Every structure is written in structure tokens, then in C-alpha cells.
Amino acid sequence: MAKNNAVAGFNALNGVELNLFTTDELKAIHYATMEVLMDPGIQVSDPEARQIFKENGCEVNEKTNVVKIPEYLVRKALQLAPSRFVLWGRDKKFNTVQECGGKVHWTCFGTGVKVCKYQDGKYVTVDSVEKDIADIAKLCDWAENIDYFSLPVSARDIAGQGAQDVHETLTPLANTAKHFHHIDPVGENVEYYRDIVKAYYGGDEEEARKKPIFSMLLCPTSPLELSVNACQVIIKGARFGIPVNVLSMAMSGGSSPVYLAGTLVTHNAEVLSGIVLAQLTVPGAKVWYGSSTTTFDLKKGTAPVGSPELGLISAAVAKLAQFYGLPSYVAGSOSDAKVPDDQAGHEKTMTTLLPALAGANTIYGAGMLELGMTFSMEQLVIDNDIFSMVKKAMQGIPVSEETLAVESIQKVGIGNNFLALKQTRQLVDYPSNPMLLDRHMFGDWAAAGSKDLATVAHEKVEDVLKNHQVTPIDADIFKDMQAIVDKADKAFRGM
């Protein structure tokens, strides 16, 4: 079912590939999903969305708000949805291509409500505030393996005082030149977000549409519901040319079947229903196939994200997206640890590597702790190192006449070493080279202060926040952007 311009299962960045399903198994998931979209269907709470579905041939029950979506509409939507689109940054060097069968990218986690702060070997977890968003954005602007910025935490100091979500739009744009992905948008305020971007482009609405420097994420309500907010984010995103991420957060054993294959069916139905709505609204609307689906721990009553199941589900979703010819955005680099510790390192590596090898286009989760509730800047810079190692693993072992190196082996001969070879010196950067992870012997490590990884990461965070320079927004333009936020605040307060 992949489009002709997409190569299912291929990832341009990796030489090692993880295949979870046969073509027949992918078809089985698809056909099971088509059954579910007709029976029981999807509950659509938004009247405007129901009308769009109805006008395009869906059966709509206005008493129950249930919409039944036939397979031919799904197939039509999948043909219309682009396999490739660009996430624009304020600085074009940060432009990021999202393409089915393209490169793997990473972004930070969102959206938590707390931050874990590290000082003198101690951890303190506190409510997140707007300044935390600014600091994390600056950190992501620096981090070479974070390709764009997703809203990491809530500005809880603004909650109830102003238009929080609108503040959460401008603050990231001001503190990173990378693309901004708004993970917590409010449907009724999308016009404000659009106007902020329009102001950035000097009032040029067409430029804002062609080069959107932000995008949005919405979540269906599992099982099988599209809320008013979700529908309005989809509809307005399509109309304004804003890329939209339809991301299911199903919990296997809770809001979806305990069998992971069954969970993929409900997940697929939820995501496809949103993608169909986007394409019925504006054919060709830019959409991701998204996932933060995991399992429900029936013994502890939690939804763990540092589990092998999350990694497997995210890898599976990447394969489903490739089957449909769509860019994917999946959870990974996830951890249930409360602080940046051994558990975090293990869980993050596992849940990153699986979807990366499956060819997910974006893996989000950098900096996340405590089942998605907490964000750590120290963990973010550690994750930046983990991603560089995963990238190296993804390259595999290239085999060619050059890399087989027969002439070099013959030249060096028996019992000698390869250190003096010109080839070795030229490829000094060929091996993996982490920034923070320590590879010294004990004596050198002790002489440098015997610092553990969290301490080294904290020092790097302080250095970046003090010294890294973000490409600024022109002062007059920023004033116009701020005026939109002020307008939203006045509307929130009823002024």
C-alpha cells in the first residue's frame, strides 16, 4: 500500500534494519482495522468534523456521534497524504525533512509537568515553568542530535493566568532556531499560533503557509474517539498549512486489547481516522502517523514507557507508517526512572534502538523521566550522546573493496599494527566518539575529578545555558509576535 515514491522498510540512515512483520501480517492488521472503522466506528465529538465525514460518504449517527469510515475513503486519504514534507526552522540550516523511507530524526519529549533539577549530587523535582521551556529550547538548539524542538513541559506558572498554550508557542520560537512542534495545542487558539508565525514572516500569510516554523500534535482518545479539540486541531492545521501529528496513546490491556497486535488495530483505527479527516478537509494536508502507545501495567496501575513493549510498538508503528507511505513520529528514548541513573540509561537505549532500526522518521523522548511526567536537562544531554551511538550502530558494517582493506592488510603484514597507516590517520573520526560518556582508564578519570555522568552532564548544561547563542528574532518582528500573545491573554481574561 506504500506509495510509488516511498520504499517500505528502507531507512536512508541505517545499514542495519529491523523487520517485524511480513507483508501478509501488515495486510492482516490493515484489514482488521478496516473492520473496526466500520464496526463499531469512531466517535467524533465535533459537529464540524462529523459534517465533513458525512458530506464525503461516511455513515454518521448524530445521536451517538459515531462515524463509520469505509475503506475506499481510507485508501483515497492515503493517496492524498504526502510521503514527504519539510519542517522549517528559523535558520534554514535546521530544516528537517520528514519522509517515509527517509532518515531517522530525534526530538525532545513532551509534555511533562515537572522538571528534575540536579545540583551537588542531589535531585529536586519541581513544577515546570515558562523559563524551563526557554532553557530546554536553548539546550536543544545546541544539541546536534536533536533535530527539532517539541514542547517538553507545561508553563504551569501561567496556567489560569493567561493563554498558556499561546505563551508555549512564542517562548520556544524565541529560544531556538530549530522547528517547533507544539505537543499541547488548543483548537480554539490555533489562529493565534498561525498569527504568531505570520508576524514572524512580516505579515506574509503565504510565506507562513509555505514555510511553517511550527507544527502541532493531537491525540485521539482511546479507544476510538476523536474529541472536539483533536478535530479542530486537525481541521485548522489542514486549512492553515500547518503539519499535524495524529498520535495515539493507547494502553495495551487498558484502553486497547492486551494483545499487542490487537492494540495496533485500535491504534491504527484512531490514527487513520484523524488522517482521513485531514485529507477530507484539505487534500494533501501534511500529516504524521504518530504513536505514544504502550502497555498498561495491570499490577502497578501505571503505563510504563521504558519497557521493551513500548520499543516494539514504536518499531511496529514505523512499519505500519511505511506500509501506508507516511512519515512516522513515535515514542522512544523513554524511561520510568525518576532521575538520570542506570535504569534511565538502559531503558532509553533499548526504546531508542528498536524504532530507529525500524526506520521511524522521528523518535521523541529525549530528556524524559518518570513515565513522561518529568523532564531533566541533564538527561537530555546524556540522550544526545546516546543518539550519536545509536546512529553509529545503525550504519552497520559497510562492505566494499575499500573497507575490506586487503592492500592495507598485506602492507602491514604479520604481527605489526595499523596505527601508522595514512588511512588510519585520515579516519581518526571514523569510530564512535561520545561527548560525555567516559572512555579513559581509571587513573585519568580519577585525576579529572572522579565525576559521574550526571555531574558531567550538569556541567555541560550550565555551560550551554551560559554560553550558547541562539539566532535572535529581529526586535521589531518579535514585538509584533509578542502582541499576538498579549491579545490572547486579554481574551483569556475577558478584557
From Swiss-Prot:
The keyword Ribonucleoprotein does not apply. GO terms for biological process: methanogenesis; methylation. Keywords: Methanogenesis, Methyltransferase, Pyrrolysine, Transferase. It is an enzyme of class 2 (transferase). The keyword Disulfide bond does not apply. It holds the Pfam family MTTB. Pathway: One-carbon metabolism; methanogenesis from trimethylamine. Induction: Induced by growth on trimethylamine but not methanol or monomethylamine. Part of the mtbC-mttB-mttC and mtbC-mttB-mttC-mttP-mtbB1 operons. It comes from the Archaea. It catalyses: Co(I)-[trimethylamine-specific corrinoid protein] + trimethylamine + H(+) = methyl-Co(III)-[trimethylamine-specific corrinoid protein] + dimethylamine. Can form a complex with MttC. Belongs to the trimethylamine methyltransferase family. Catalyzes the transfer of a methyl group from trimethylamine to the corrinoid cofactor of MttC. This is Trimethylamine methyltransferase MttB. It comes from Methanosarcina barkeri.
